[in-house]
Structures are given as structure tokens and as C-alpha cells.
Amino acid sequence: MDRLRIHGKTDWNMPFLPCTPWLCCAFLLIASTALKAADPKETTSPPSTPTIPSAATAAKGDPAASPWPGDRVDQWHGFVRHRFAVDGATAWVVEPHQAAPGKPWSWCLEFPDAFTDRTGVLQLLEHGFHHVHLEVGNTFGSPRALEQFEAFYQVLQRGGLGPKAALVGISRGGLYAYRWAAKNPERVACIYGDAPVCDFKSWPGGKGTGKGSAGDWTQLQRYYGFATEAEALAFSGNPVDRLAPLAKAKVRLIHVVGDTDDVVPVTENTRLIESRYQALGGQIQVIHKPGVGHHPHGLDDPAPVVTFIRESFRDGKP
């Protein structure tokens, strides 16, 4: 009897059957099938279905679950907050439990953690608004800050938020909100100014009846690149000077002010905005708080502000 040679050695215990034509064909067929199964280039599988991450997954910090770059996740007043970097600044986006149709959003440009129970931002989140902020610091709506805001807006658009924002300008945040809005009126549904600075000659300049702030005035001139104080005083890009683009775009305005505010006097800021905007045909509502100064910001019941902002996104509006 013939013996089978395995790996060059003769196995005297294993019989070797003579190779008939039909047996050779069967062997080759089996070998070919085995090779194909072992070759990944020859295997096919159904295309995978992309998984859409849930909010719960995002809350665990899964970076694949978020549209935001370099996302870090935490909580903000019981809502999921995404933190990431944009143009050298820390940005964050708070998402509602259930986004409203069109993904409307509010943007607090400065002091985003101040008086949140009085400014309506938490109620807007409950109504399905996203809420965002970019930390540019005490830069007074300077040209560099506006560049960073532009980069942030582009990220928000790539992330799927609606095309227009409800801007929230608290105190000096009024400079940030109005100056960005004047450059981008088509991206703004409304502005909520709360004791807002609308002319930096008033604050921090202190050139009117208000207290002013010498240190902030010096810092503002540096951020804006003014060579002299006279150049700052001649500047024509304050919110009170740049209302025409907003009126043309029909941006709605609402202000909340304390009538005894001696830091950001109403007569030098909100009253100028009100009279000039109305003269341009714009819509503005001012809520006065008799006997109240610069603080506290907001309202005991912010429902009027919440209603105003929500109405700005209804009836074919953004």
C-alpha cells in the first residue's frame, strides 16, 4: 500500500488513495471554496446602517455623538452642555431636551451665568431653544471679538442650528450683541438688551452722567486699537450709531432697564436706541423697573421676554 507524505515526511500509518479524476476535481473544488472564504477581498456583507447617537450617549461624552469639534460634555442647569474651542476661545452649546422645529437658539454674548433665573434663557431651553456662548472675555465687542463671533457662527451652522439667533446682551454685553448684529442683521431674529451698554462713551467712558470705569475705558481703547482718547470719542460704530441695518432687516428689540441705573444710565443708552429705532420704523419694546438700579438684571417673572423671543421665531419668521 502506498503511504502519504506530509511536509516531506512519510506517514506509514495513513493510507494514500490513488487520485482518480473525479476525486481530484472534488478536492480542488473544496480547496477553492475554502480559500475564498478565507480571503477578505472576496467576502461581502450588507452595508452597515449609520447609528444616530442619542442624547444619553452624548451625555456620556462619546465624541462621535456630537456635531461639535473636540467636544467635552457636562451639565448646565440640568441640560446637556457641549464645550469646545473656536478660534482660540472656549465655546459652549446647551441643548434642550427636545429641540423645537427649525432649531431656534439664543446667544448670551457676555455674563452667560448671571441671573439665569431672571433672563428667560432657562425657559427658552424648556421650549426647545438651544443656548450658546463664546468666551471672548472683557473685550467690549472689539473688532477681534467680532471675528471670533463670525467663526463661532459658522460652527453653529455646520452643527445644524437655525440661521437666525436671539441675541442676549446683558450690561456691557449690549456692545457685543449690537455690534455683531449690525454687521450680520440677516442672522438675527431679535435682541434682548438687559441694562445694555449702547454707547461706550457712557460706559466705560463715563462722559455723561454715569459712573464710568477708568480701567475698563483704558482697556477698551487698547482692544479697539485707538491711538488716543479723542479717536475713541469720535468713533461712529457704537450701537446707537448702527441701527439702520437692523431696522431694514426688521430685527425686533426688547430692553429691560432699571430707571435709577447710574452705571449704564437709561437716558444715554436705551432711550437713544428707542427713539432712533422708532424713527427708522423699527419695532422696540422697553420694560421699565421703577426704583431699580443696574442690578438685579432680568425680571422676577421673565415671561414677557420669553414670549417676545418666541414670537420672533413664529409666523414665517426665522
What are these language model-derived features?
Residues F115-V132:
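Short amphipathic alpha-helix adjacent to the substrate-entry channel of hydrolases
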Residues P101-F111:
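Short beta-strand element of the alpha/beta-hydrolase
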Residues G160-S171:
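Alpha/beta-hydrolase fold nucleophile elbow
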